[in-house]
Design a protein with these regions (language model features):
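Catalytic beta/alpha-barrel core
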Residues: 60-62, 78-91, 100-114, 127-139, ...
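Active-site mouth loops of central-metabolism enzymes
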Residues: 15-32, 56-60, 79-85, 105-106, ...
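Catalytic alpha/beta core domains of metabolic enzymes, predominantly
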Residues: 10, 114-248, 252, 257-261
Length: 355
């Protein structure tokens, strides 16, 4: 993807900020918010026109009626304007309205058939296309959606990290799983990746710290939900902030752009490589012990899974990790994955299938 073009060619390089309401609810609401976003120094305005809601009966957007409002915001305040699309029909209407770009939502990204239809409908266009991550933390699904657009000739492309659905209890609406966008960047280093702290956090008080964390991790910008009267919003009211709060948030962000010298960076990376190698060696050693335990259990007709033992191990690891300043959630994920592989190895021993 070395031939990608800037998302918006007339904007200065640096972090890209996009802001606007979850939904375009009325002309007055949209223009009031657009003015506030403009005054906050943001040059790209977003608003949902068609809203794919989880349950029927929720506000599903104003539809094509709202497209002229977005066009008016563009012309009145000199903003680039974008909205979400999910079908070729949406794309046709957006192009007729003269909008500057679109984003593709998480539910649509999840569906390869829908993505191919959208990619075909966008063939030959030169508007900005932003692709949100799929609902599940599947980097192949995300990169595949982007590749479909790229293969259709789209060159103004970016990804948007909005977090992932989870059955686990977390302080966030959508678990960030930062490793997924980091892996996407490793695979597609030329692709800009923005973060959407509004959808990750789900509550307005979490937007600023999540925005700062994203920039600390090297994200190329932010997409933030902003509403002139957020408490009266017809959708996602809790996660939207006022234009004034948006300006304060952007002013508070620290851009860590000072480059580390290449020699120092190389040394850090070599150290990381060495540690990773040791981790793999230790994991291989641990799996060897797990297989020996599997042999013992088979010889004594014992069940492979000993739930009490794993719970004890997990609690001890989480307690130790907390003292070391490591996230309990992270340790839980790591040890669960290790336990799963250990069980797989022991089951293979039971079946004489270990290789």
């Amino acid at each position: 993807m070395k031939d990608l073009n800037p998302i918006f060619s007339d904007l200065a390089s640096g972090s890209l900020y996009i802001a606007g309401p979850c939904s375009a609810e009325s002309r007055e609401q949209l223009l009031a918010t657009a003015l506030g976003v403009h005054n906050a120094g943001v040059q790209v305005f977003r608003a949902g026109v068609w809203k794919p809601r989880t349950r029927p009966g929720s506000f599903e957007g104003m539809g094509r009626e709202a497209l002229p409002w977005l066009r008016e915001a563009k012309e009145r305040y000199g903003l680039h304007v974008i909205t979400e699309v999910a079908t070729p029909e949406h794309i046709e209407q957006v192009l007729k309205a003269g909008l500057d770009g679109v984003w593709i939502g998480a539910r649509t990204t999840t569906n390869p058939f829908a993505m191919q239809e959208i990619a075909d409908a966008l063939r030959g266009t030169d508007i900005a296309i932003l692709v949100k991550n799929p609902v599940s933390p599947d980097v192949d699904l995300w990169s595949g959606a982007i590749e479909r657009l790229y293969n259709s000739g789209i060159r103004r492309l970016a990804a948007v990290h909005r977090g992932f659905g989870t059955h686990q209890t977390t302080p966030y609406r959508n678990a960030p799983h930062w490793s997924v966008p980091i892996e996407l960047h490793r695979r597609m280093p030329e692709l800009p990746i923005l973060s959407d702290p509004s959808h990750i956090g789900g509550r307005r008080e979490l937007v600023q710290p999540l925005a700062q964390e994203a920039l600390d991790l090297g994200f190329d910008g932010l997409m933030i939900e902003c509403h002139a009267a957020p408490d009266k919003a017809l959708s996602d009211a809790r996660q939207q902030i006022t234009p004034e709060a948006l300006g304060e948030l952007l002013h508070s962000l620290i851009l860590r752009r000072t480059p580390v010298t290449q020699d120092a960076l190389r040394d850090y990376r070599l150290h990381i490589d060495s540690l990773d190698s040791r981790l793999l060696e230790l994991l291989a050693e641990r799996m060897g012990v797990a297989r020996e335990i599997g042999e013992y259990k088979r010889a004594h007709a014992m069940a492979v899974v000993q739930h009490d033992r794993f719970n004890e191990l997990l609690l001890a690891a989480e307690a130790k990790a907390e003292k070391m300043g490591i996230s309990k959630h992270f340790v839980h994920q790591i040890f669960s994955a290790i336990h799963e592989e250990s069980v797989r190895q022991q089951v293979a021993v039971e079946r004489d299938e270990i290789r």
